[in-house]
Design a protein with these regions (language model features):
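S-adenosyl-L-methionine-dependent methyltransferase catalytic core, i.e., the SAM/SAH-binding region
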Residues: 1-311
Length: 311
């Protein structure tokens, strides 16, 4: 079986969850099953709940993980909704959670998915049943809407002019492919950054298509409300917007005191911590991993340990 995607930070994931003995492990973003396969091999008593919104990836992983079918439950779902579909008993026995918030190599390399700068299509939907694709956004959003998402999700300082250029071109003919869009944007780089403006525009469009920041926040909000007991959460991000969200939530969860910073003394009880941050700094790929898989270079993993704390 040819594997179309190399899992990032695999050794670091195995190390983070090395003490798992039994219970359930939730892979919120199963993809092509690399992380889950490794964990199932190393932990024979572990049961897996495997979730992905990409039908192609889920079907592939069902075949890949066939040897573990008695310990694996597959769910077609966006990761922000998966917690609503797990029974109370399983949530109580949840010992590990992984969310790898990135586009797979298969999605990037598959021409029809339209994620690649040189693709003949303009799609970018991780869930192929979703109604809005990159085509609708590029051809139907107003100049102001496009400018806003380029600034907000691409952190582009000239998003207005890029949006203006796109709107001028689409008046002549609809923009039908990623490579057309790439040619319109051009190959110039954003000031003080190594990536091209086109890459940042594509990032912004992809985030808008899949509502990536919104679904990440939804997942984190739901995790905050669940009384997880002795459970390790690992989240892998690939750009600063997502990583910033995860970092801030982890800091919030680790706080015992939630009083206003201007308060002279603690009045909240000083017992609100959900657990602890396992590593203060984000875990990044080794030089050796980046040499083997250059796409891993942007990956950052943060770990949080939910303790047994009854509120």
């Amino acid at each position: 079986m040819k594997i179309p995607h190399i899992p990032v930070l695999l050794n670091e994931i195995n190390q983070a969850f090395e003490k798992l003995n039994s219970g359930y492990f939730l892979d919120c973003t199963l993809g092509f099953g690399g992380h889950s396969e490794s964990l199932l091999k190393d932990h024979p008593n572990l049961k897996l709940i495997a979730c992905d919104q990409d039908k192609e990836a889920l079907e592939f992983s069902k075949k890949r993980l066939h040897d573990f079918k008695d310990r694996t439950e597959f769910v077609l779902s966006n990761f922000s909704q998966i917690l609503d579909q797990i029974s109370h008993d399983k949530l109580n026995d949840l010992k590990g959670i992984l969310a790898d918030i990135g586009v797979s190599s298969y999605q990037l390399d598959n021409n029809k998915r339209g994620f690649n700068l040189h693709s003949d299509f303009l799609d970018m939907r991780m869930n192929q049943d979703a109604k809005i694709s990159a085509f609708e956004i590029i051809n139907n959003y107003t100049q102001e809407q496009l400018s806003d998402i380029f600034k907000k999700y691409g952190e582009l300082n000239d998003g207005y002019f890029i949006a203006q250029k796109i709107c001028q071109e689409r008046q002549k003919n609809k923009i039908k492919s990623a490579k057309e869009l790439y040619e319109i944007i051009g190959k110039t780089k954003q000031n003080h950054r190594s990536v091209s403006k086109a890459t940042l525009v594509f990032q912004a469009i992809r985030i808008e298509v899949n509502q990536e920041l919104k679904v990440l926040k939804n997942l984190l909000e739901k995790l905050e409300k669940i009384k997880l007991k002795n459970c390790i959460l690992a989240i892998i991000c690939f750009h600063s917007l997502e990583d910033r969200i995860v970092k801030n939530y982890f800091k919030k969860w680790a706080k015992n005191c939630i009083c206003d910073e201007r308060a002279f003394r603690c009045e909240c009880g000083n017992n609100h911590s959900l657990g602890e941050i396992i590593s203060k700094k984000a875990i990044t790929p080794s030089k050796e991993e980046i040499m083997i898989n250059s796409r891993s270079s942007c990956a950052k993993m943060r770990l949080f340990h939910f303790k047994n704390m009854e509120k």
